[in-house]
Structures are given as C-alpha cells and as structure tokens.
Amino acid sequence: VMRVFFVFPGQGTQRPGILHGLNTFGLSVLEEMSNAIGLDLLTLDSAEAFERTENVQLALLCAGIGKCRELEAAGIQPSLVAGLSIGAFGAAVAAHALSLTDAARLVLLRGRLMQGAYPSGYGMMAIGGLNLNTAEDITNAVDDIYVSNINSEQQIVLSGPLSSLDIAAKRAKDRGALYAKRIQVTVPSHCPLLMCPAKVLMEAFQKVEVKRPKVPYLSVNSGRVIWDPTKLVDDLAFNMARRTSWLDAAQAAKERGIDVLIEMPPGGILGSLAQTTFADGLVISSSTTPAEEIIERIGRLQ
C-alpha cells in the first residue's frame, strides 16, 4: 500500500478568489465553517479582505479541508498529515483530532490575535542561498528579528519589524544571499514576539475537545509525530510563537516511509521545497492536479 502524506500550507500562498471556484466538497466545508463563525466566508475572499490575517487563515483552512474531503471520497487516504503554521489546524482536522467547527472558531480567534498584536510595521522575509548559521549571525546582529522558518537547506525565513528586516536584507546580500524578499504575511510569525497571543489562544483551547488523532499528526515545529491530545493542543496553540522547520518535517516523513506527498490548496510551495527529499517518490500539488489524475499517478507508482 502506498503511504500518502497530506500537507497543508501556511500563509503566503493565498490568492483572492480561492473560495469562488470550490466544488461540492469545498462548498459544504464553506457552509459548515460560515455557520460556525456566523460570517459568510465567501464575502471574506477578496484582495481587500485578505489584508486581514484572520480572513486569509479561514480561507486556507476552508480550501484545504475541502480538497482533503474530495480526495478521501475518491479513495485516497492519508497515512500521515502535517501543516505549516495555520496549515496545522487543517492537519488536525484531517487527523480527526479537532472538529471543523472548533477549528473554524479557533482559527478566526488566532488570526485576530496575531493581527491585533502587530497591526502594522511587522512582517516576514525569505532569504535564499544562505545556511542557518549565517542567517542566525544576521539575526543576532539586528534588533528584534528572529529566524522563524527553515524551509529547506537553501531557504530561511526571518520575522520582525519591517525596518529591521530591511537592514537584515542588506546584510544578507552582503553575505552572498541570492535573494531577500518579503512574503505575504503582515505579522512576525513563528518567533517569541507572538508568545502573548499564543497564551490567549491556549486558554481558548481549554473549552474545546481535542481527541487522539486517528491519522499520525506530524508537527512542523518539532519534526515529531504527536498522539497525545494535550501535546497536540500545545503544538496548535503555540505554533505561532515557535520556529518551524519544514526541512526537518519533510525528512521525518521520508523516514516514516512516505511514498506520495500531496499538498492541499493553494499552491505547491511545500512540495517544491521537499522535491529533493522525495526524489524517488511522488510530489503532487492538488491545486493543479485533478483527483482522477492523482489516483492514476499513484496507481502508476505501485
């Protein structure tokens, strides 16, 4: 049996209109989430609405779970799930550890807390072509910035005030970086600057039932599989304030014998970053590959 890995991306991959082309699976998720939060998600799917973190995060959860349900209905079952940042909530729903209704409410709160903590003047920046040691040298020399995501051997993300990121960009280029570019996130995610909102989110989790996952849930913060519901709550609540390593998570998935990585919408960034890790398997972006074709490609691999 092919071992399939469902991966849910984080912010930075979104584009307005993502919820306007949903099929019946996506529309039922949209309706369930809209009812849960008392807002029509379709009205939050525009360039203007996407300037607010919570609207982007809700759209990503909706698109991801819609696709997940479509693939499962077509007979593609995951052996492992993981999500980067907001994607972790999609992974927890896919693992049957968190209900979609609870996830929708928590994600709305999470986005509002993140946006409220840093309404403006903060962000994230991807640096290409420098290793982790060099990136950490740069963050140590510039105030208030942190290494927040280790995406691959050659891509590191920094978080902090925009003024400090500008200084870091110049230093990175001086050290030989191929690029230093801002990503579409308006808050300093995955660093200690978000510890206060994370604690508030943790309190909200106390009113929610989180079960033992039915599908192994891989943390992109620790690179380990989590079964214990208490540890899962900790992972979901605090992931906004902790460094992520997609590099380590992809490696951990490979070591668990994963043959096929399927990235949920939107985009295919995590899959392309993990291409070298899964060189002898299949990496598929479900945004651009119809379910029938995914089944066919998995069949050819067997």
Task: Locate predicted features.
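Alpha/beta catalytic cores of group-transfer enzymes, especially the acyltransferase/condensing modules
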Residues: 11-12, 35-39, 95-241
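Short, solvent-exposed amphipathic alpha-helical segments in soluble enzyme
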Residues: 23-24, 142, 173-174, 276-280, ...
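Short glycine-rich catalytic loops that host catalytic nucleophiles or stabilize transition states
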Residues: 183-186, 254, 286-287
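FabD-like malonyl-/acyl-CoA
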Residues: 2-134, 179, 260-290
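A short, acidic, amphipathic alpha-helical segment used as a generic capping/interface helix at domain edges
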Residues: 241-258
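Short, flexible loop segments at boundaries between secondary-structure elements
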Residues: 222, 282-302
